[in-house]
């Protein structure tokens, strides 16, 4: 099952206890089966290895602030499992450009140079979407 496989990769992190409790709940097996079936039939964003990227990049013990996004970006090569973040080299989507405008208004020009926000996550910013996966059929 796709979610179980990806959650196993969080083994040894401080998110492990939280997800162990969730995995034991009745809904989780149904959710895992649903996401696994969707990924087998459709394009799902982000790629499986990035579904839990927000948790890998920002340990629970390091969380200082949470920035919630709506759902993953749905253009090829954009979704990386961190809300608002796209790989460097990708054009910043409108929502990220708005964040950059606000940062520059507060901190001055040039403070937002990278579209990949992994460094933010490593500094305690949990960049979490309220929906972790999105299939093309829902767009």
Name what the model sees in each region.
Residues 137-139:
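Conserved small/polar residues in nucleotide/adenosyl-binding loops
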Residues 72-74, 132-135:
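Short, solvent-exposed loop/turn segments at secondary-structure junctions
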Residues 1-92, 116:
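Active-site and ligand/interface coordination hotspots across diverse enzymes
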Residues 91-108:
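A gly/proline- and charged-residue-enriched helix-loop-helix capping module
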Residues 124:
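A residue-level signal for beta-strand positions that form part of recognition/binding surfaces
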